[in-house]
Amino acid sequence: MINDLVSDALTRIRNAGMRRLDVTTLVHSKSVEALANILVEKGYIESCNVVEDGVKKTINVVLKYSDNGKSVINEMKRISKPGRRVYKGKDEIKRFKNGYGTIIVSTSHGVLPNDKAYALGVGGEVMCTVW
């Protein structure tokens, strides 16, 4: 049994990128699905779709690579962990890596990237950073 589905999803995407795989499969949860949709929106992965196999759901993620075959994702890092939750206010999540990276935040408005959370004026739990 997996305790932290977000960490598992980040690790699976990171490992698939290092192996230069086209597609990887993630365990489904609402937060992982929201995370994958943000990664698609920000251009870090090509696409994601939810696959239902009876009762069990999974998410198929198609990875994105640059022209020279290198993964578009340089680093994915889990910030808030089950043993140590990290919360930031709206002013602390304004920019990451001078705008080249994204902070993914779980807010009262749902899971949002840092630019949308800042525009809405909400802070929350920092799930991960991607650049």
Curated annotation (Swiss-Prot):
Matching PROSITE patterns, A to Z? RIBOSOMAL_S8
- Record bears the keyword Iron: no
Q: This chain belongs to which protein, by name?
A: Small ribosomal subunit protein uS8
Please give the SUPFAM superfamilies that the UniProt record associates with this protein. Answer: Ribosomal protein S8
Record keywords, A-Z: Ribonucleoprotein, Ribosomal protein, RNA-binding, rRNA-binding
Subunit architecture? Part of the 30S ribosomal subunit. Contacts proteins S5 and S12.
The role this protein plays is:
One of the primary rRNA binding proteins, it binds directly to 16S rRNA central domain where it helps coordinate assembly of the platform of the 30S subunit.
One GO biological process from the UniProt record? translation
Q: Which GO CC annotations does the UniProt entry carry?
A: ribonucleoprotein complex; ribosome
GO MF assignments: rRNA binding; structural constituent of ribosome
Membership in a protein family: Belongs to the universal ribosomal protein uS8 family.
Among HAMAP family, the record links this protein to: Ribosomal_uS8_B
Gene that this polypeptide is encoded by: rpsH
In terms of superkingdom, the source organism counts as Bacteria
